[in-house]
Amino acid sequence: MIELGVSLCPFFLAALFEIRGGYLICLWLRNNMRAVFGPLGRLMLAVCGIIPTFQPSHFGRVYAAHGGIFIVFSLIWDLFVDKKIPDRYDHRGNNNVCGCFHYVLRLSLIGRYSVISFCNFQTPRQRISDFFLSRSIKHNFYLFFCNQTLGNYFV
């Protein structure tokens, strides 16, 4: 479980820097705050682009994972910093993203696209049968999240 936290830490940092940097630029341009907010926001956005390079996976996979974490962090930011409760459009957008993520998971189980590996099965048929015939799907998700590092989530 500690490995999972260590693997997710750069993603959380990148999301925090991206949201904070964009927020500072927004304050600077929209609310006419001090001029120091603009360069500071740009610096934070630049750091946000550098942080994901510490992940071992390739660029596309890292940014796909970063995108999911960014969505969650932006809603948390909206709730606690801007004091805005997410409305129905926010929830619809989140549901669309979760639906797309669910679709990608299904494709990886079928074996059409090997995006996410739940277990280290060799063939798509083994992946499907062993996933559904084991103790439970919940058990497999537990094994997936607790026993692999983030770099091994992506095949």
Swiss-Prot record:
Places the protein is found: Cell membrane
Source domain of life: Archaea
Record keywords, A-Z: Cell membrane, Membrane, Transmembrane, Transmembrane helix
Topology class, membrane: Multi-pass membrane protein
GO cellular component: plasma membrane
Ranges that cross the membrane: 8-28, 35-55, 62-82
InterPro entries linked: UPF0060
Disulfide bonds: none
Family: Belongs to the UPF0060 family.
Protein name per UniProt: UPF0060 membrane protein MA_3936
Organism expressing this protein natively: Methanosarcina acetivorans (strain ATCC 35395 / DSM 2834 / JCM 12185 / C2A)
